[in-house]
């Protein structure tokens, strides 16, 4: 199984990157953004962006980590330049105390413009990772009204726990990942304390999913306030795993089997592996999970998208009646890392594919029925002579697609925009 995160680090500059775009369809780099559609930002070493969001004013925020395990953020203008109204440089790093490096994996924007980043660190100089959430003001400064000087941690008391996803709902902050060997979910108040009206008075819930281990990579909140988690679980190999909870933290028994859904995406064989890395909820309530799966023992991973009804059943209107699509892209593994729904109901998946010795930024689009949209791509972009990958994507109000991830050698934040 391939992890959807990569421990890389970040050097203090922004500049053009050598890119060669190889679109197979109409999607192409936007030449009005950065240098020929891309920009790179380094934070003093090596590093990578994990996620990206678009502010209402069109400015772009990406978050990840640097070589020291600091949380790292960059904000860009609509043209791809670093926004100097953000911490004076367009960049922010936050050091987290503890005996292990921090890892920032998730990013969300509040309605008031505050920025929430979630991941993991080892607080109080312990060796055990805990959920870690940091909130910033719109100018990039730490929001000292949140947690302890802008930082909050959640200990599930079940061994190590790490956050991989964050979502904002009203005044609540939802954070999901794993604790011990199961799915983990916490709800925080706007001040960064656990919300004790959730999870039987604890503010947290954990769920055993599958047979041995499970991890939630993504989180979305339905219109009715119910949280949906997606990731993977062990079950005769690894499979897409989803859970849905009530607003008070109980597993929602109207979803799947007892609130859980397990999907073998590529088939049943020795070594079958499938991981949901991302999740989106359509306006009609259907749920789209994207990631990757293999379809033969020892075979390459393929980009995967699976659609479920609001009850957790595979959607027979998607993927030629199966509810599932697998797409081979490039000459090796094709990994989906993030998903978004566009204004027409199309499903955009970003990740990476292989071409020769290197990974490339990769975007793919499916129509609302799961058919490959060849008028779009897939499109792959090489970033220098080095591995590159999309780890997060967001769609602007004008339909342009912004992706964030890593590339170059030494490795840096990479942000690109497609039209």
Placement of each model-derived feature along the sequence:
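Bacterial N-terminal signal peptides
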Residues: 9-19
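Bacterial N-terminal signal peptides that target proteins for export
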Residues: 1-10
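Extracytoplasmic mature domains of secreted or surface-exposed proteins
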Residues: 3, 21-419
């Amino acid at each position: 199984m391939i992890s959807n995160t990569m421990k890389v680090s970040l050097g203090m500059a922004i500049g053009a990157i050598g890119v060669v775009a190889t679109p197979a369809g109409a999607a192409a780099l936007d030449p009005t953004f950065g240098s020929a559609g891309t920009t790179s930002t380094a934070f003093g070493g090596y590093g990578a962006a994990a996620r990206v969001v678009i502010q209402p004013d069109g400015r772009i925020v990406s978050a990840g980590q640097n070589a020291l395990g600091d949380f790292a953020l960059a904000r860009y203008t609509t043209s791809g330049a670093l926004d100097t109204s953000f911490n004076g440089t367009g960049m922010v790093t936050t050091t987290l105390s503890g005996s292990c490096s921090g890892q920032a994996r998730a990013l969300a924007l509040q309605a008031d413009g505050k920025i929430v980043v979630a991941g993991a660190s080892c607080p109080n100089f312990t060796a055990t990772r805990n959920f870690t959430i940091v909130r910033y003001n719109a100018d990039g400064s730490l929001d000292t009204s949140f947690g302890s000087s802008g930082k909050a941690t959640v200990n599930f008391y079940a061994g190590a726990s790490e956050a991989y996803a964050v979502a904002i709902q009203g005044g609540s902050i939802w954070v999901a990942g794993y604790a011990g060997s199961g799915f983990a979910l916490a709800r925080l108040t706007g001040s960064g304390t656990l919300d004790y009206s959730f999870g039987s008075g604890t503010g947290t819930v954990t769920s055993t999913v599958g047979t041995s281990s499970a991890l939630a990579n993504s989180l979305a909140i339905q219109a009715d306030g119910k949280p949906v988690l997606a990731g993977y679980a062990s079950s005769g190999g690894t499979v897409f795993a989803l859970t849905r909870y009530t607003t008070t933290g109980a597993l929602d028994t109207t979803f799947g089997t007892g609130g859980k859904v397990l999907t073998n995406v590529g088939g049943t064989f020795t070594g079958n592996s499938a991981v949901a890395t991302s999740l989106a909820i359509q306006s009609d309530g259907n749920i789209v999970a994207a990631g990757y799966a293999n379809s033969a023992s020892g075979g390459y991973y393929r980009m995967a998208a699976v659609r479920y009804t609001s009850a957790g059943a595979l959607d027979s209107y998607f993927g030629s009646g199966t509810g599932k699509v697998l797409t081979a892209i490039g000459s090796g593994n094709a990994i989906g890392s993030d998903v978004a729904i566009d204004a027409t109901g199309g499903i955009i998946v970003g990740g990476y594919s292989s071409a020769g010795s290197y990974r490339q930024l990769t975007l793919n689009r499916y129509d609302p029925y799961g058919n490959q949209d060849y008028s779009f791509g897939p499109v792959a972009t090489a970033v220098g002579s080095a591995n590159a990958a999309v780890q997060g994507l967001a769609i602007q109000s004008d339909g342009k697609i912004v992706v964030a991830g890593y590339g170059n050698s030494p490795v840096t934040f990479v942000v690109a925009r497609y039209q």
